[in-house]
From Swiss-Prot:
A single MF term (Gene Ontology): magnesium ion binding
Origin species: Tremblaya princeps
Gene coding for it: ilvC
Cofactor(s) needed by this chain: Mg(2+)
Residues of the KARI N-terminal Rossmann domain: 1-179
Record protein name field: Ketol-acid reductoisomerase (NADP(+))
SUPFAM superfamilies tied to this protein: 6-phosphogluconate dehydrogenase C-terminal domain-like, NAD(P)-binding Rossmann-fold domains
Residues given in the record as NADP(+) binding sites: 24-27, 47, 51, 132
Family per record: Belongs to the ketol-acid reductoisomerase family.
Binding residues annotated for Mg(2+) 1, in chain numbering: 188, 192
Gene3D superfamilies cross-referenced by the UniProt entry: 6.10.240.10, NAD(P)-binding Rossmann-like Domain
Keywords from the UniProt entry: Amino-acid biosynthesis, Branched-chain amino acid biosynthesis, Magnesium, Metal-binding, NADP, Oxidoreductase
Keyword hit for Transcription: no
EC number, UniProt record: 1.1.1.86
One Gene Ontology cellular component annotation held by this UniProt entry: cytosol
């Protein structure tokens, strides 16, 4: 797999176009500010509200989504996945200029045919592999965020446009990898659900609950199962698992080898395959889309339960007393 850098693309391609950023959440703000700082003309498409005010505070003059799209060569859709198809149908599709392209930072709505691409409309994806605030922070720092890019239909014009956009958004410094809408979507969802969010959060809570229910102090359980997680991940992020094992004690490393597979064993791997199958068959997407159409009852209930878990109160209390938790 080839990794592209700034020298492998032409940032002037996107600089010659007007980009409408539709949405001004975490990703929308990062894209808009990075593109502007890279010399791209950016217009913001928003409804009145807090995001509208935030964009104005950042020096933009937001317009309605329809107006922003109608004057743009590229419409980058950065609204939440669950409402993007509705925004596209009502405020984007019929307002695109001839020859304009639709862009995405995640392939969900294209992969699952919520936004059909065709009838002369080209689409590309420039997906930074980090939350929005980190996309902005790494751009400012000069090392950027890795990007995945794709085009539909697959043609050199859209490919070059996607790479150019990724460079302007900071990807040229960190690396740009070509993929497809389907592969980006399926791997992204699996990583979030099985490892980065779903798997990791459940692992932390299970460890915390095991220690507390066995009679250990909640504060000790928090330190061992949550606080130290970042320290471990930072080492792995810099040098991989081998670097981690070089930095820990022989006792910790031996425990990794003999107990890790007991926790993450055959049953977990089988569950991961079932999660991936739900993603690949579209079952998860169908459930998520219906969740959004039903006013998100599962999300609401689960968010409430997360806030009520004992680890949250313990963590908040300890973090308020630790200068290291505040970056000082």
């Amino acid at each position: 797999m080839r990794v592209l850098y700034e020298r492998d693309g032409d940032v002037s391609i996107i600089r010659e176009r007007v980009v409408a950023v539709v949405g001004y959440g975490s990703q929308g703000r990062a894209h808009a500010m990075n593109l502007r700082d890279s010399g791209v003309e950016v217009v913001i498409g928003l409804r009145p509200g807090p995001s509208f005010d935030a964009a104005m505070s950042d020096g933009f003059m937001p317009r309605s989504v329809q107006e922003a799209v109608s004057i743009a060569d590229v419409a980058m859709l950065l609204t939440p996945d669950e409402c993007m198809a509705d925004v596209y149908a009502k405020a984007v599709r019929d307002y695109l200029r001839p020859g304009a392209s639709v862009a995405f930072a995640h392939g969900f709505n294209v992969c699952y045919n919520q936004i059909p691409i065709g009838n002369g409309v080209g689409a590309f994806m420039a997906a930074p592999k980090a939350p929005g605030h980190m996309v902005r922070e790494t751009y400012i720092a000069g090392w950027g965020t890795p990007h995945l890019v794709a085009a539909k239909p697959q043609c050199e014009h859209l490919r070059a446009l996607a790479v150019s956009y990724a460079i302007a958004n900071g990807g040229g410094a960190a690396g740009i990898i070509e993929t497809t809408f389907v592969d980006e979507t399926e791997t992204d969802l699996f990583g979030e659900q099985a490892v980065l969010c779903g798997g990791l959060v459940e692992l932390i809570r299970a460890g915390f609950d095991t220690l507390v229910s066995s009679g250990y102090e909640p504060e000790l359980a928090y330190f061992e199962c949550m606080h130290e997680m970042k320290l471990i991940v930072d080492v792995m992020n810099r040098g991989g698992v081998a670097a981690l094992n070089e930095s820990i004690s022989n006792n910790a490393e031996y425990g990794e080898y003999v107990s890790g597979p007991r926790v993450i064993g055959a049953a977990v791997r089988s569950a991961m395959r079932r999660v991936l199958n739900d993603i690949r068959t579209g079952r998860y997407a169908k459930d998520f889309i219906m969740e959004g159409r039903s006013n998100s009852p599962t999300l609401t209930a689960c968010r409430r339960a997360v806030g009520e878990h004992p680890i949250e109160a313990v963590g908040a209390r300890l973090r308020s007393r630790m200068t290291c938790a505040h970056g000082t």
